[in-house]
């Protein structure tokens, strides 16, 4: 996986990628970045058709500032990917955010995710009217760990006409 908004990616290339996405409205593109500052810097140069969903990774409170960079874009759907969630995210400002995805880390040496962190994010989404999607608990065997939270799965997504 790569990051379209990496500093080494020229604006002209980003504009070409957006042009392709603009020309294919039958597809929904979920673009995810960790570089919210660069996103905020170049967003005004891009054509944001409704099929381009923009998101930022927010894995712990050290990077909560990324939400502000996302919020300032003209994307029609704005989302947070809190995966892997490696710490609590208290007091998020979810104004202008449409969707939050939460998941634990998987692989050989995953850092544990606390249920309390997930429940707090879910509560914050409810307060702000934001769709909440719980992807997985993570771990060395993510299928075995599953994706059930409070006795059910959480699959809310924005509906775009």
Regions found by a protein language model. Give the residues of each.
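Auxiliary Fe-S-binding modules of radical SAM enzymes
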Residues: 86, 90-161
């Amino acid at each position: 996986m790569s990051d379209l908004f990496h500093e080494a990616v020229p604006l002209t290339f980003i504009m070409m990628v957006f042009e392709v996405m603009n020309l294919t409205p039958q597809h929904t593109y979920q673009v995810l970045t960790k570089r919210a500052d660069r996103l905020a810097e170049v967003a005004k140069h891009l054509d944001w058709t409704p099929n381009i969903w923009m998101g930022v990774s927010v894995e712990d409170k050290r990077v909560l500032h990324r939400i502000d960079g996302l919020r300032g874009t003209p994307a029609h759907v704005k989302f947070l990917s809190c995966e892997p969630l490696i710490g609590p995210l208290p007091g998020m400002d979810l104004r202008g955010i449409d969707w939050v995805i939460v998941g634990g880390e998987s692989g050989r040496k995953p850092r544990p995710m606390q249920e309390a962190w997930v429940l707090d994010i879910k509560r914050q989404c409810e307060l702000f009217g934001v769709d909440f999607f719980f992807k997985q608990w993570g771990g060395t065997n993510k299928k075995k760990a599953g994706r059930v939270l409070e006795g059910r799965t959480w699959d809310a997504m924005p509906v775009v006409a």
